């Protein structure tokens, strides 16, 4: 069967035809590491990890680029508020994001470029836009001229988001000398105390949108297959990426995919609303593989409404799969069902794919009860193939029953130690607090103190 994906740009299901036969090129807008990652952040990573795994399963060679926005207004503000160097702040939370992705079984990207490492490419991109008449310099800043681009032949500005140009305002704070309210910064002139890099237009730092256009085309070429990201990036970020790229003469992304939000009580999960659930906090409730199962269980274009009940139900669903594979014993990866393939080829319809997995588990348990071991092994092999595509094959995760019990026991023991440490810190008994931390470190357990609380991970 042929994979069809929902292309946000055309608002239609389109057959995926790679630019280069046998290869797929994918760019995912990654982290802006300003704070601890929450499950809204990592849902995007899990959703498009499933896309990547399915492309690989269909025999394609996949170049997967996931960037890090390591210079940004919010990063500078957060670092300044806490009296920390911006680069230290970024490095701290970049490690947190990497840990979260790895813990949830997200495959590492082919390359993970940082914005600050690609200023040369950004300068070249800006020069092309200026030469083409779609960017201008004012007092050391460089802006994209939206009015000029909209008037140009072939312009499609606003088509991705559906916004009307006359209703758009970019919200740039440093807008002195801008020709129009819709114009956005490609390069921001240096301010005292802020990091900056030299350019032909003076010292400064990159604008958010320019970073991704420059990095995507540098690694994947002027035209590539799929650009992914969260729905909240559709405007202004992705709309402006397209404008820059097309104005520079690049074909850019041929398909656009956006995952929906994680919500709580109907509200989008965000730091500003104070309704975030950090990954470490979630891992106090369920195992990493169960959290991955939960985050990937809804269709990527659907809202995932968080509740304790839904999380518990998802964890129980995974354990049913795990228990069946454990009962069968050692089994090789088999072949997925036709229904599973049809579901995945229809815009990654994971809920339907999960139904196929659970049907196989039910049939397999019935086969075991009837003593039909050959049939049970065949079904377990199919389950391994299907769960492998979704990134939670129980055998690959090593989460058989004994390991689960050991993990739960470890959780209890570490939690007790952390409570003892918290009590000591509250009483300013630093010697005891340090003793607990050092004892855990000697056992290979790293204690992580963050603004959202304390968490732990195996070193």
UniProtKB/Swiss-Prot annotation:
Keyword Cell membrane: no
Example of a GO biological process term: cysteinyl-tRNA aminoacylation
Cofactor: Zn(2+)
Pfam families given in the database record: CysS_C, DALR_2, tRNA-synt_1e
Keywords per UniProt: Aminoacyl-tRNA synthetase, ATP-binding, Cytoplasm, Ligase, Metal-binding, Nucleotide-binding, Protein biosynthesis, Zinc
Cofactor note (record): Binds 1 zinc ion per subunit.
Binding-site list for Zn(2+): 29, 212, 237, 241
GO molecular function: ATP binding; cysteine-tRNA ligase activity; zinc ion binding
Motif ('HIGH' region) on chain: 31-41
GO cellular-component term (any): cytosol
EC primary class: ligase
Catalysed reaction, written as an equation: tRNA(Cys) + L-cysteine + ATP = L-cysteinyl-tRNA(Cys) + AMP + diphosphate
Residue numbers covered by motif 'KMSKS' region: 268-272
EC number of the protein: 6.1.1.16
Binding, ATP: 271
Keyword match Zinc: yes
Chief place where the protein resides: cytoplasm
Annotated compartments: Cytoplasm
NCBIfam families found in the cross-reference section: cysS
Subunit description: Monomer.
Family assignment from sequence similarity: Belongs to the class-I aminoacyl-tRNA synthetase family.
Protein name per the record: Cysteine--tRNA ligase
Gene label: cysS
């Amino acid at each position: 069967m042929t994979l069809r994906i929902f292309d946000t740009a055309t608002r239609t299901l389109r057959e995926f035809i790679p630019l280069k036969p046998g290869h797929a090129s994918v760019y995912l807008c990654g982290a802006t590491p300003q704070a601890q990652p929450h499950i809204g952040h990592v849902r995007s990573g899990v959703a498009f990890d499933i896309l990547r795994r399915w492309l690989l399963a269909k025999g394609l060679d996949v170049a997967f680029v996931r960037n890090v926005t390591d210079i940004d207004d919010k990063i500078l503000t957060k670092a300044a508020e806490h009296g920390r160097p911006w680069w230290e702040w970024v490095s701290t939370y970049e490690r947190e994001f990497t840990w979260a992705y790895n813990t949830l079984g997200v495959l590492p990207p082919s390359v993970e470029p940082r914005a600050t490492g690609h200023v040369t490419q950004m300068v070249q991109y800006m020069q092309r836009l200026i030469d083409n008449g779609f960017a201008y310099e004012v007092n050391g800043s460089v802006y994209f001229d939206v009015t000029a681009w909209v008037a140009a032949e072939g312009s499609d500005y606003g088509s991705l988001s559906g916004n009307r140009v006359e209703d758009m305002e970019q919200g740039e704070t440093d807008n002195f000398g801008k020709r129009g309210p819709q114009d956005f910064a490609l390069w921001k002139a240096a301010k005292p105390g802020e990091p900056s890099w030299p350019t032909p237009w003076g010292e400064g730092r990159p604008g958010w949108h320019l970073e991704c256009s420059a990095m995507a085309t540098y690694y994947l070429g002027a035209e590539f297959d799929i650009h992914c990201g969260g729905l909240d990036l559709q405007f202004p970020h992705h709309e402006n990426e397209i404008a820059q790229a097309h104005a520079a003469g690049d074909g850019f992304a041929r398909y656009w995919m956006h995952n929906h939000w994680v919500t709580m009580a109907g509200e989008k999960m965000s730091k500003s609303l104070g309704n975030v659930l950090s990954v470490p906090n979630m891992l106090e409730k369920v195992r990493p593989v169960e959290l991955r199962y939960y985050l990937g269980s809804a269709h990527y274009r659907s809202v995932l409404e968080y509740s304790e009940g839904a999380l518990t139900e998802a964890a129980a669903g995974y354990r049913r799969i795990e228990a069946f594979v454990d009962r069968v014993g050692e089994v090789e990866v088999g072949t997925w069902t036709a229904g599973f393939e049809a579901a995945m080829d229809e815009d990654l319809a994971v809920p339907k794919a999960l139904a196929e997995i659970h049907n196989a588990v039910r049939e397999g348990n019935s086969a075991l009860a009837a003593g039909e071991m050959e049939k049970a092994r065949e079904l377990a092999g199919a389950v391994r193939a299907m769960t492998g595509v979704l990134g939670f094959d129980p055998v690959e995760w090593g989460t058989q029953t004994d390991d689960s019990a050991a993990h739960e026991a470890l959780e209890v023991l570490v939690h007790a130690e952390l409570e003892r440490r918290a009590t000591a810190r509250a009483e300013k008994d630093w010697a005891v607090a340090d003793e607990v931390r050092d004892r855990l470190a000697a056992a290979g357990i790293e204690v992580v103190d963050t603004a959202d609380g304390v968490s732990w991970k195996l070193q």
